[in-house]
Structures are given as structure tokens and as C-alpha cells.
Amino acid sequence: MSTNFSVPEPTPQLVKVAESAKEASISLGQSTNKQRCEALTEMANALNDNADEILKANVQDLERSEKEGLNKSLLSRLQLTKTKLKGCIDGVLKVSNLADPIGKRQLHRELDENLILERVTVPLGVLGVIFESRPDALIQIASLAVRSGNGALLKGGSEAKDTNQSIMDSLDKGLRKSNVGSGALSLLTTRQESLGLLRLDKFVNLIIPRGSNELVQFIQENTRIPVLGHADGICHLYVDNSVDIDKAISIALDSKIQYPAACNAIETLLIHEDVAEMFLKKGLPIFSSEGVTLKGDTKSQALGVKNKADESDWSKEYLDLILSIKIVRNVNEAIEHIRKYSSRHTEAIVTEDKMVAEKFLSSVDSAGVYHNCSTRFADGFRYGFGAEVGISTQTLPPRGPVGLEGLVTYRYYLRGDGDLVKDFASGDRSFSHIDLPL
């Protein structure tokens, strides 16, 4: 999305779509767990039945986008292979097997005799989702929206317009076969609609951007609706001096090359000076054979890293087979570097020293902080959340990979029998505040 556009008032047509989504979301939020699970099954079946059409549409999008010069990392995200589509369909079914997030009683308290307070989870209402390139995000978020009883207005990038339309046609077909209906999900197709969406604070309860730093920042600066997301994925891996070199190299490789366009891939590798020579002597040929371009500080260049890293590289999200390397004196310097340049997404340490590991885990303020494992584990599916709506790097919850729990809020129910505050204010009655079983 270009940031040169001012945010216009939503068109009457868009307002009508939003009103319909709001009304449908109320009905969806009151549906039973069984009805929503059946709807997800029908959605998965429809996607499977129309898989060939979806993949054909994706080829059209890829060919057009390549001709238009879409960069390599976005082309990678745009591509929907048969295997990836099958994984998405399986993900829809797995979401249906997750525990119902609606109607969970979080608090049950007697304020006084026959005056009972409850706090119960309820859907947010309507989600506004804006995403670039990744058509699989449409499937993930649509399934989570239905499972959590929320409506959704979904706007994908123009580069994926044919794929997204084919997917939405399939989802709509599945919903029409269920008892839930299709009005809760709507696909927005124009830039004007995506901009107008930001002004729909009367109808939309949460904006979820999935895309570039530029996109997320623009949305955060131009809407009064709460935004769930992260602008950057500048992730770090620190290799300590108390380390198994082979383990460290394999973790670094997985964190970078397993899917370099992902927001949880590392962009900077920090290495303790005591093991830097050993690590780079063994690791450089391996990184080179995998096609990774390395950029290093002066110390790492002296040990064989060919390209120089400048100041801007430490805060750059490459989303490609490029990795910055810096040699540090100790874990404290590594932590200071991360505090200065991290986007607070995911960081990891490789060390056999448990005390150093605990210091790192407790000192680094990111959504995910790992010990002896790849940063690529920062994912809702890998956490067992089912498909994720996104990753949040904000301090307030939800934080990190956000699944169903981030799509519900809560409501207080108080049931009494003619109870009046004046009776408590006068001292005629007093609060018991007894917690009851959930």
C-alpha cells in the first residue's frame, strides 16, 4: 500500500458491507461450537474441491507479478504450491479441533448472597485484515475468524487478486453449506476500500495488518481502530563461548535459510569473540554453499567475512539470503546490541551455560526469547495455537504469535435480585467476595 494516499471517508457501499459483516458477526458469535466447527469443515472441503482452480489462479498472479517486477521475497510469499495449499486446508481442520474460545468463564465470584459476578470470553466483533502477497493468510485468518465467532473484512494485495478471489469463492461456498452463512466474511478488492476500512471504527473492532514495515506503520498512524501486528522482524541469534559449534551452526542455518522471507528468520548473528574464529572457519563454507551473503563488522571481516556491514545493516530486515555478523565480547554486549536494534520479535541464544542462558532470557525484552533452538519456531501453528492471525511485538497482550486467544475479549455478567448499591454504601449489606468454582 502506498503511503502517499490520504485516508478517505469510506464509500456508502463499503459502509453497507461493514454493516452486513457486523450483523452477521453477532449471529456468528451466538452460534454453537458445533455449528462453527461444521462450518470450518465445509470451508476445508470447498477449498479441497476447488484446489485446481485456486492453484491456476495463483500461477496467473505469479506470472503477472514477475512481469511487473515484484521483488523475490514477495514472489516467494505469493507462491501457493499444492503442498502449501494442502497444509492450509489441513490447518482449517486443525482449527476446528481447537478448544472453543467463546464462553470460557474466567471469573466466578459471589459479591453477596444471590449477587453473582462472572467474566466470560466473547468474540471481538469484526476484524479488518489487510495483507500483502500471502494468499495463505486469507485462509488462516478466515478460519480463525469463524472459529472465534468474528466477522472479517479481508483485503489482500493486488498481486494476489486472482488467488484471493478464488479462495474467497471457495470459502463462501463452504459457508453457504453450513448453518453459519456467508455474510460474516467479505473480500475487499480495491485500494480505496482498504483505505476506507481504516475509518470504519463504528463497525471494525481490530485491524490486523500482514505485510511490509511500510504497510504496518501506515496503518498504525492512520486509524483509531486498535492494530495487532509488528512492523519489522529483525531477529538475532547470539552464539556464546560455552557452545557446541556444530549445534550453533545448524541452528544458525535453520534460523536463516529454512525460509529467509519469513519475519522470524534471523537478520543478525552475534558471536562471542572466544569462539568466533572456530565458528566462522567451519561455518563460512557452509553458509556460502547455501547461497547466503554475509556482511560483517571489522573483526569478522578479519576472520574471512568478505562484505562489510555498515550501521544501517544492523537495523535492516533483509527477508532474503543475507546475514549480518558481529563479534561481541560477551553476553552483555550481545544483549545491548539486541536492545538497540531489535524489533522485539524473536531472539535466541546458543549456549551450554545455563546461567548465561537465563541471563539472556530474562534480559531480552522480545515477544519470543529462545535457548538452543531456531527462531523459526516463532509461529502459532508450531506453538499449537492452530493457524495464527499474526505476530504482535507490543508489550501489552496479546504478544508473540496470536491465535484464537487474541480474537476474543471478555464481558462481565452480574446477576442479582433487586440489589442496590445504596444498601452497601449505608452499611446495611456488606460484600462477601467469595470466589466460586469456574
Swiss-Prot record:
It comes from the Bacteria. Keywords: Amino-acid biosynthesis, Cytoplasm, NADP, Oxidoreductase, Proline biosynthesis. It is an enzyme of class 1 (oxidoreductase). Its EC number is 1.2.1.41. GO terms for biological process: L-proline biosynthetic process. Pathway: Amino-acid biosynthesis; L-proline biosynthesis; L-glutamate 5-semialdehyde from L-glutamate: step 2/2. It catalyses: L-glutamate 5-semialdehyde + phosphate + NADP(+) = L-glutamyl 5-phosphate + NADPH + H(+). Its main location: cytoplasm. GO terms for molecular function: glutamate-5-semialdehyde dehydrogenase activity; NADP binding. It is found in: Cytoplasm. Disulfide bonds: none annotated. Pfam families: Aldedh. Belongs to the gamma-glutamyl phosphate reductase family. This is Gamma-glutamyl phosphate reductase. It comes from Prochlorococcus marinus (strain NATL1A). The lineage of its organism: Bacteria, Bacillati, Cyanobacteriota, Cyanophyceae, Synechococcales. The gene is proA.
